[in-house]
Regions:
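N-terminal secretory signal peptides that target proteins for export/translocation
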Residues: 1-14
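Generic N-terminal simple sequence motifs
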Residues: 7-8, 24, 31, 40
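Bacterial N-terminal signal peptides
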Residues: 15-29
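N-terminal low-hydrophobic presequence detector
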Residues: 3, 21-22, 216, 387
Length: 387
């Protein structure tokens, strides 16, 4: 729950996140890419890091919030504006992720934000990625952890063309209240200037969980760009095929079968897709956040996996006539290539998505990831869940 200036911090790429999936289902690669253990290198053993997967559980629910936003934190001026609003936080990925939506009113009118929290089990850290309704651009994540009931996450950023460190802090945590503060530092973290301060009090009359997120939407015009993903809402049986070694001439593929659930969030301006599948090498999970930018009339798509615990560089594109295509440029094996991710409607009950790479400027494309979706009817969902 915060607002930030534009940042130049580097994010992991969409390809690097999808590569994690390829690694998960490729046992030979796992052995090759496994990090050198401290004992193998002759280094002294270190205590294992504390599992922080449940550190943000206090944040779940519906909250009333009072916000003070400092207009120029680095000037030392106390001038600020105040806002009042509501924060709703839902659990995702069995607690390894959270989705937060905030609405607030202030002197400059109505303001909304969307925050995705992701836990990295390898580093035992959380990442915090934010979208503002006014900019609709994903901010690079803050990363950090909790210690003694206090959470601190950090990032490098810029404020009015000045390089700063950014810190978000959760403190004074009780079952029905907590304090959140975002601060800036120009001196390497020696001193911090508050920029965004919020006090949150639980609304005991309301609850929030993943089932509250709309799994469908009322029919809307498919010609409207902002409704380009309407066909995708719901639960889908998913068959996935992944090329194990892209751009190498290899024809070795691996298959997985699972389910994808796509839910509308943020009043329809964004949606969240959760995929869980199983193949010969085990269980795979993937989360995709897609959001519409009303300023550019474009859609963005970003991915995360449990092993990475962080969103990457988003693909950017448009949806038209039931087909959405996203592009970005990334470095693969030391070479820059184009990446294309496409998803399209086949019928009311079927759809398909593909990822492809091009190393010749888009003249030719090699598909490396194919997902085929079949809609699960409400009666089938009840039978699958055992209800």
């Amino acid at each position: 729950m915060f607002t930030r200036a534009k940042s130049t911090a580097k994010l992991p790429s969409m390809y690097s996140l999808s590569l994690v999936l390829l690694m998960v289902i490729s046992q030979p690669q796992l052995a090759f890419l496994a990090p050198l253990k401290a004992a193998d290198a002759g280094a002294p053993a270190t205590p294992s890091a504390r599992d922080g997967q449940h550190d943000f559980e206090f944040n779940l629910g519906v909250w009333h919030t009072h916000i003070r936003r400092v207009l120029d934190p680095l000037s030392g001026s106390p001038d600020s504006i105040e806002l009042n609003g509501t924060v709703t936080v839902r659990k995702l990925w069995d607690g390894r992720a959270q989705l937060e939506e905030i609405e607030a009113e202030g002197p400059k009118g109505h303001w909304e934000g969307l925050t995705l929290f992701l836990y990295n089990p390898q580093s035992h850290q959380w990442s915090q990625s934010f979208l503002s309704s006014r900019m609709a651009a994903l901010q690079p994540p803050l990363v950090g952890s909790f210690n003694a009931g206090r959470g601190e996450l950090f990032a490098q950023d810029t404020f009015r063309d000045r390089s700063i460190l950014l810190r978000s802090v959760w403190s004074d945590i009780t079952p029905d209240s907590h304090h959140y503060e975002e601060s800036y530092s120009e001196d390497g973290g020696r001193t911090w200037m508050p920029a965004f301060v919020a006090q949150l009090t639980r609304d005991r009359d309301k609850t929030a969980d993943a089932s509250d997120i709309a799994a469908g939407a009322e029919p809307m015009s498919s010609e409207q760009e902002e409704h380009g993903f309407d066909f995708d809402f719901g639960t889908w049986k998913t068959h996935s095929s992944r090329l194990m070694h892209p751009l190498t001439g290899s024809t070795a593929w691996a298959d997985l079968d699972g389910y994808t659930v796509v839910r509308r969030v943020w009043g329809g301006r964004a949606n969240l897709a959760e995929y869980k599948g199983d193949g010969p090498a085990g269980h795979v999970e993937l989360l995709a956040l897609r959001w519409f930018n009303p300023n550019t009339h474009e859609w963005n798509i970003d991915f995360a996996t449990p092993n990475v615990g962080m969103l990457g560089i988003p693909g950017v594109g448009k949806c038209k006539n039931g087909r959405c295509e996203f592009y970005d440029q990334e470095q693969i094996n030391g070479r820059y290539v184009l990446v294309r991710f496409s998803i399209w409607k086949i019928s009311d009950d079927s759809a398909q998505s593909e990822q492809a790479f091009s190393d010749d400027g888009g003249k030719t494309w090699e598909t490396n990831w194919i997902n085929k979706y079949t809609r699960v009817k409400p009666s089938e969902r009840s039978a699958r869940s055992g209800t």
